[in-house]
Amino acid sequence: MTPGKKNSYNSLKTILIDNKEYKYYSLKEAEKNGLEGTSNLPKSLKVLLENLLRYEDDLSVNKNQINSIKEWLKSKKSNTEIAYRPARVLLQDYTGIPAVADLAAMREAVKDKNKDPNTINPLSAVDLVIDHSVQVDQSAKSDSFEKNVDIEFERNGERYSFLKWGQQAFNNFRIVPPGTGICHQVNLEYLSKVVWTEEFQGDKYLFPDTLVGTDSHTTMVNGLSVLGWGVGGIEAEAGMLGQPISMLIPEVIGFEVTNKMPEGTTATDLVLTVVKILRDKGVVGKFVEFYGEGLKNLTLADRATIANMAPEYGATCGFFPIDDETLKYLKFSGRDQHTVDIVEHYAKEQGLWASEDIEFTDTISLDMSTVVPTISGPKRPQDKVLLTDAPTSFKKVLEEATNKKDHSISKVSNTDYEIKDGSILIAAITSCTNTSNPNVLIGAGLLAKKAVELGLEVKPWVKTSLAPGSQVVTDYLEKAGLNTYLDKLGFNLVGYGCTTCIGNSGPLPENIIDAIQKENVYAVSVLSGNRNFEGRISPHIKANYLASPPLVVAYAIAGHMEVDLYKDALGKDKDDNDIYLKDIWPSNKEIEDTLKQSLNAEMFIERYSNVSEGPSQWQKIQTEKSSIYSWDEGSTYVKKPPFFDNLSDEPEGFKEIKDARPLLILGDMVTTDHISPAGNIQKESPTGEYFMEHQILPKDYNSYGSRRGNHEVMMRGTFANIRIRNEMAPGTEGGFTKIYPEEKVLPIYNAVVEYKKRGTDLVVIGGKEYGTGSSRDWAAKGTKLLGIKAVIAESFERIHRSNLIGMGILPLQFTNDVNRKNLNLIGSELISVLDVEKGINPSDEVTIEIKYASGDIKKVKTLCRIDTKNELEYYKNGGILQYVLRNMI
């Protein structure tokens, strides 16, 4: 941290904590000296205000920006652009590897300009947690964990060696090795400080812990009162190199919670309820801040579960204020007493402690006593289904999806059972959303214990797995003696990582796959994850339901989505009595008592004392020690990215977009999973052909996520999700389009190759909430490499819009209820963005011209979704990293 040299509001003060002196930028002093009323700001905006006070330099941050936070109070909204500098950056390996590759390529570009390549170095703390690569290859066996770790290192040795090179090559760059946990849970339990301490010119400074992360669920840490959200890897890389995050001061929605959850409900039920409420409200691009007397009834883990799913309810973050529960968690998770004292004193001094005297843009309220057991599905987190309605809801889903009157039934070869539409084939306790919450994990363990003791078993067609986000989870399950019962039901430990939640569910048995394909069975997964988009969990699963860990276990026993868990028996005991869910569901008191006896601070301290060592396989990996990476031309995992090749000294400026062909016309809620899938690679695809050329067998394909260090793979995989539906190619599903004027259906990548030969510009047409989901920068990088110049949609999700600009792609938004349907777009049109080459400004009205095949011409006004002046500079430079690099050389 290097504070700005200005101090317009005379806010730099000193505080004494435990007889130690610290400097800090006082919000109280700033209020006295010109920022009247700011004590009533939402706590999250106070964090932004402190950041501006600390970095005021009259260049990137000036007095007007600071004053604009005060002005926000007048209308509770603002169009002012501010420059925000988070304290640190959090990466995971799927996004971290391309980030390190970009930094390595930038070093080469600097060297080629005869400058010092070591100027490319992170200026803020960067932590990369390797959690996305482990797959559920083995499950339901005592040695599943060991086998999966071995396979993980066999597949990813080259990638991990590259990351080890990055750790020694770059400053301020730490790696948490594989097999440790999920980045957000490690962040919550270990990395976060709530209040950051840093030395500058001999003085120690205190300031709020803040971060951005290259994973959309970075928001989880807001449950610990650490302001953070997901950004694309390209924006994170720019932030590492000192570029502030350009943002508009957000609206803040106050979410009041009252009362407490009733007996028999979980934090998962609560968060799925919150997701539905806030999606209906509409909070995209806004902060949500929780307050109210109900906060005292939410544990820190409950808050983290709610904060985790901010991307699912559309908000930039879901922030919780500092209070006694925050301090309790810090102590409980092994933080030292002085750290806890700093947090308490600083929060109370700065007005960051929980209070009720807050002015919000708007408010919404939830009486938590009304929460009931809930699941969400079949394909969106906001598709809330009350557990009581689950069987009838699924029947309706099945009827709409298949038009079948009767179930497809398929015999599974070499077994004595059959599967049918609605059979649950995957049941996974997975994801940081829930495995960070001891109450629901203990709940699942107690339910398993009762089920086993009563003689219940999981159905044989269900693939079961347990993948916690932290090693502490297995410690307390073992101490409670519950791991034995989970193991007996097939929920053996398979790894510490994201696994099924991100699509790394591993293969289903061949005889199960054959049975699905033989009768086109509409198969189901149930997982304790945060996303259930189409095609995400497994290529063979059509419907995915999110549920609490105890319900995941219950559904694995039930085996079918049409089982009514309230009315239908799950099985019989030894005396032939029916057993129902209510007979095995643990009480809140049972959970609390077990938790008190099995979880303590020493577990956190011990597990994180040697967090950087990693397993023996990690320790054995060798890497070169150098500042410039030696690229292996034959590698199919890590290639030098092309984004900085032949970089001109001057910005590219505004480029003409004329007579562009639509490459895809897409509907609503197209996710970044649709645009750039993370999971399975199909043999019959352009990527499969590429692998065939490089003599790579299907068993060694790994996943798209693991190949993000290779642009050749990723550009072929862009828009290759098996469930994407391009309206230009009706009757197809997957990565296909129709090329014009021939009207020939081709794979997306093959069509791009053909259009490139012709010198044809390309655009993508979208519906509402284009780019929702993961903060996947490859969804923008791949779009760029395909030659797409603009994306024209009805609305954009926050992170993807930013990523498009960060790659030099123009986002345009339809206005006045105009859309692809009432424009009658089919893909045969030629589209021009008029006068863009003459220059545009943020939020300009931009006219597009549509030439129809009939000869008709229509002009349509759109909104330029370049929102800030900084974003405009990024666009003119062809991307944010190109902008940063030009400024450095």
Q: What is the role of each PLM region?
A:
Residues 1-889:
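Fe-S-dependent hydro-lyases/dehydratases of central metabolism
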